[in-house]
Regions:
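N-proximal short alpha-helices
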Residues: 2-6, 13, 69, 73-80, ...
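Amphipathic alpha-helical packing segments from all-alpha helical-bundle domains
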Residues: 99-110, 165-173
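Short, charged, surface-exposed hinge/linker loops at domain edges
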Residues: 38-92
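Short, contiguous alpha-helical
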Residues: 1-49, 97, 108, 112-164, ...
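Generic structural motif recognizing short loop/turn segments at the entrances and edges of beta-strands
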Residues: 54-60, 114, 181, 188
C-alpha cells in the first residue's frame, strides 16, 4: 500500500491478519515485515498454524495499490486491497477469525507479564501499560466492533468474563455479516477481510509496543 504522496509504504501479509509494517520505501517495508516474522510466529502458534507460517521462505509482492493520506501520515494501512474485497468462504472466514483471536490471546498474555510502567521516549513522554491497554480495547470496541453492530458498555471490558463476552459477540457479528453478504459499517463500508486484519494489526501493534517498552528486566 503506497501513500498518495509516496511518503510511506505499508507491506501487508494478506494471509496473516495483523502482520503489516510501514516504512519509507517498499523494500524497507518488506524488510521490516520480515523482521517481525519471528514475533508473529507466536500468534500463528496460538492459532495452531505455526508449521504453515514457518514454512514461508519468500515474500512475493502480489499487488501494489494506493493508500490514503493517513497511510502517508501514520505508516499504517488505511485502504482496501483487491484481496480485501474478495469473497470469503465460510472456512476462509473462520481461519481469519482464528488468527484474530490468536492476536487477542497474545495481547492478553503480554499485558499480564509486562511492567506497569513503560519505558519513556527520549523526551520523557509515552503511555504506561494500563493506558495502552485501555486505548487498544476502547478503539476496537468503539471504532471496529461497532461497525458490525456490537455495542458494549464502556466498563464491560474491565473483567475477563466481560471481555470474553464482548469478543464472542464481535466474532458472531462478523459471521452474521458474512452470512448476509454485508460490508461492515453504515457510512464507511469496510470489507470484512479488512476489518479483521485492521483490528488484528491494532491489537498486535500495541502488544509489541508493550513488549518493546517493558521494564521488567531493566
Amino acid at each position: 500500500e503506497i501513500g498518495p504522496k509516496g511518503k510511506k509504504v505499508v507491506a501487508v501479509a494478506s494471509d496473516w491478519p495483523g502482520l503489516e509494517r510501514g516504512a519509507k520505501t517498499g523494500q524497507d517495508a518488506i524488510e521490516r515485515l520480515r523482521s517481525y516474522s519471528l514475533r508473529y510466529s507466536q500468534v500463528a502458534k496460538r492459532a495452531e498454524m505455526e508449521a504453515e507460517f514457518d514454512a514461508i521462505t519468500n515474500v512475493d509482492v502480489v499487488e501494489q495499490y494506493s493508500g490514503t493520506g493517513s497511510t502517508d501520515f501514520w505508516g499504517i494501512s488505511f485502504a482496501f486491497s483487491s484481496i480485501d474485497k474478495q469473497d470469503m468462504s465460510g472456512d476462509e472466514l473462520e481461519r481469519e477469525l482464528t488468527l484474530m483471536q490468536a492476536c487477542w490471546a497474545f495481547f492478553d498474555d503480554v499485558r499480564k507479564r509486562v511492567s506497569a510502567e513503560m519505558q519513556k521516549g527520549p523526551r520523557g513522554g509515552g503511555r504506561d501499560r494500563d493506558h495502552i491497554v485501555q486505548h487498544a480495547l476502547s478503539t476496537e470496541q468503539k471504532a471496529f466492533a461497532k461497525m458490525v453492530g456490537v455495542l458494549t458498555a464502556d466498563d464491560a471490558l474491565a473483567t475477563d468474563s466481560g471481555l470474553k463476552a464482548y469478543r464472542d459477540a464481535y466474532d458472531q457479528a462478523i459471521r452474521s455479516y458474512h452470512a448476509q453478504g454485508k460490508l461492515a459499517g453504515k457510512v464507511a463500508k469496510w470489507p470484512l477481510r479488512y476489518l479483521i486484519r485492521h483490528a488484528a494489526f491494532h491489537t498486535l501493534d500495541h502488544a509489541w509496543e508493550m513488549e518493546d517498552k517493558d521494564l521488567t528486566a531493566k
